[in-house]
Amino acid sequence: MESREAEASRSKEEETLSPAALLFHAPHFNCHIIAVMGCKIPIDPTIVKLGLEHTLIKHPRFSSKLVIKSRKMKWTPTTVNVQDHVIVPNLDNKIESPNQFIEDYISHLTTIPMDSSKPLWELHLLNLKSSYAEAIGIFKIHHSIGDGASLMSLLLACTRKTSDPEALPTIPMQKRASASNSSTASASASASASSNGLQKLFWNIFMILKLVWNTLVDLILFVSTILFLKDTKTPFKGESGVDLKPKRFVYRSVSLDDIKLVKNKMNMTINDVILGITQAGLSRYLNHQFGKNEKDGDRKHKKISLQKSIRLRATVLVNLRPVVGIQTLAELMGKESKGKWGWGNSIGYIMVPFTIALQDDPLDYIRKAKATIDRKKLSLEAIFTFQIAKLVIMTFGHKMGNCR
């Protein structure tokens, strides 16, 4: 009798995977999130395990395993043994190239499938001094557990300030225009609106029409890309079967202070600056690749043709949640958090075109990036792509949703 009651209670706690979570379990699309964090001091695995037991393990997604019942994937609560999830390899501190070793370790980690008999997450602790940290922690989390916004908020909710062990960390709010400028602009706008309400009405109608037009164009381009519209063949475009080959994580550190300096001077966002830097790097690299065998006299012509012939785009995931910021750990643990805050995978897709061209003024890369991002902000592409993907998965299944 007791076993039946326990089984009934467990069934009530089970939760069917959402369409977005199912997509990340589709064949050829088994996605994981790899997060690397550096520490200024060596990591004590005992303290880490103790902290996980009081924080991360309490979240339903990190204490549930994936089971298939009646041909449906479900999250089923289970007893978590932290020892099975925290991996501490024995390392030789005399490794000649620690940075290279860490890159190889992470790359190898992406080739190992996760054990579905336990919750789909792991934490690897590497007490190995590198050029950027005394020790490294590597999270490997299946994407069906949650997206980046969910996981970052949960991670921050599990931490506390060093100055106040009981307080959550604070995140600087986005800077707006100064109070005086805002007041002046507001007063000017109010005067203009009161003196010419018809002009304001026409402006609102124009912005709505622009939103509809941008959304329609973006959706047509999105569908066209799925069907026939491909990027130009460049060194960045992978060949068929590239998704099955081992991956390597290569990165470079940049100064956030430098990015903030450009951002503040040009009155832009960090995303604008980063996209501009990316466009500059891609343009210069492609020009070097395509023009490396040309003579100096012909190189200028090659640069001009580069500006007009390259189609290069990136798929960017966009957080669709209306609420932003750090949620308390208690809120993230509650059942109502799923509906109120949207734990899981609430992300849409947008296609961002790169402007591949050589600019005489380096700041032009950032100006063009801002124009691209501002154009994308005035579009509902992310919301529509999310809903379309959800509809396809619910109608035809997650395997069809992953058709390439």
Regions found by a protein language model. Give the residues of each.
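Soluble acyl-CoA-dependent acyltransferase catalytic core bearing the H(X)4D motif
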Residues: E2-E14, H25, I34-R404
